[in-house]
Design a protein with these regions (language model features):
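RNA pseudouridine synthases
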Residues: 1-114
Length: 114
């Protein structure tokens, strides 16, 4: 897991930074697969900070493929940050039923692991 506090980056309107005085941020992760020098991870944010997953991965030396803000501007692998919400659990606002919404991995991300 990654337990690093996050705060706004004073030099940017968009970026966040790891800062000991920032808001607590905790991310659990599990490596699911490796291929072509890339890894498929399950990331589970335990807090909900802006850019938390992107910043936490970059801060441990593993930025997301295609992440121009916290990684590299190289868009040859994928033209966007390789981040996808596969499964979301939420409570229905009327019935209170717990819903699990699943979205398969998009084609551009599947190609990265072929």
């Amino acid at each position: 897991s990654i337990d690093l506090p996050i705060d706004r980056d004073n030099d940017s309107l968009l970026k966040r930074r790891i800062d000991p005085n920032g808001a607590p941020a905790h991310t659990d992760y599990q490596v699911l697969a490796h291929k072509n020098g890339l890894s498929l991870l399950r990331l589970v944010p335990q807090t909900g900070r802006t850019h938390q997953l992107r910043l936490h991965m970059a801060s441990i030396g593993h930025p997301l493929a295609g992440d121009w803000l916290y990684g590299t501007e190289d868009k040859s692998l994928i033209p966007r940050p390789a981040l996808h919400s596969y499964s979301v659990h939420l409570r229905h606002p009327v019935t209170g039923e717990i819903l699990n919404v699943i979205a398969p991995l998009p084609e551009d991300m599947r190609r990265l692991l072929q």
